[in-house]
Regions:
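C-terminal motif of bacterial Sec signal peptides marking the signal peptidase cleavage site
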Residues: 16-19
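Sec-dependent N-terminal signal peptides
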Residues: 8-10
Length: 198
């Protein structure tokens, strides 16, 4: 009986050590933002870290991480979150010419490091294969937009969190500015979280 208990305890200890070793290999969200890696490696690490993962336009991991972040900032408490946005090039959705030009540049992964200090938001965006952030911008507001898409869209519903400086702007205003040919119609914003679903 003692021998059986020893074997069971040994097996549990080995399993526990293996689990700890795996956790130590996965960087936390802060370390992950600074990690230079391929898009596929970054995607795998983001799924193992406390990060929000968006593939294409669909949330695939970290929904609870985002919810906890949004709850804190909604109360005015400082908080940070890392979003990993992964993109592939779909041959069926682009012209053959564009596909041939761009195919070697995909997949791509962008890290969005979002910090809230209690009064303003700062977002740093870095492609996983680059050392330095491509952009760093500050915004006053984080707005939440939900709704239904037109019948011709690929998804039925959307859920977006967008940084902007205008607390009264709507998603329709932002979209109109993006597609307008009018000088000055663009509304400064950064979509940090986008989830489209049926």
């Amino acid at each position: 009986m003692k021998r059986a208990i020893c074997w069971v305890l040994t097996a549990l200890a080995v399993a526990g050590l293996a689990s700890c070793a795996e956790r130590q290999r996965q960087p936390d969200a802060d370390a992950l933002f600074g990690t230079v890696c391929s898009a596929d490696d970054g995607l795998a690490m983001a799924k193992g870290a406390d990060a929000v993962v968006i593939e294409g336009m669909c949330l695939t991991a970290g929904g609870e991480v985002w919810d906890a972040f949004y709850e804190k900032v909604s109360r005015g408490s400082p908080a940070s979150v890392l979003c990993a946005r992964y993109y592939t090039l779909d041959r069926e959705r682009v012209s053959e010419e564009l596909y041939e030009q761009e195919k070697n540049d995909y997949p791509k992964l962008f890290f969005y490091r979002l910090d809230y200090d209690g009064t303003a938001y700062t977002v740093k965006i870095r492609q996983s294969t680059e050392r330095e952030p491509e952009t760093e911008d500050a915004y006053r507001c984080l707005l939440h937009f939900t709704g239904s898409t037109p019948p011709t869209a690929l998804w039925r519903k959307y859920d977006y969190y967008v940084l902007t400086d205008d607390p009264d702007v709507t998603w329709e205003d932002i979209e109109a500015g993006m597609f307008s040919s009018q000088l000055g119609a663009w509304i400064r914003h950064c979509a940090v979280y986008q989830n489209q679903y049926d």
